[in-house]
Amino acid sequence: MKTHIHCGFHKTASTYLQRVLRDNAKRLSCYLTIINRIELSTYDLRMACLAYNSGRGKASAVRAELDRLAQRVAGSDRPVLITDEAFFGPHIGQDGETRLFPRAHEVSQMMVEAFAPHPVEILLYTRDESS
């Protein structure tokens, strides 16, 4: 089972992608297991990541939520796609944040460890800030 984790940067069509996935969930279900923010399936992990990235939460809370998700999809014979744009923390300007994903490396490592020994691909969409 390969796990794909989508962490889109703001204004990169993350919500659009999540809506398309939701609207086509039945058709995709034979090919892909989808854990989608738009269905609130990532809420607890999202909140743990936001708290950790802002310094108000602990890494252990993020690990616990990742472990719950990993258990949920354990044994899946299909690839897994987990999508939520807040896994790497608030965007610049949100909650007074002035840094761009300062703990992304740490959260990425926790993601890889949670789904081990299966491969994890982290998809981080970015955009040209000058536009």
List the model feature ranges, each with a label:
Residues 1-93, 97:
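PAPS-dependent sulfotransferase catalytic core
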Residues 87-131:
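PAPS-dependent sulfotransferase catalytic domain
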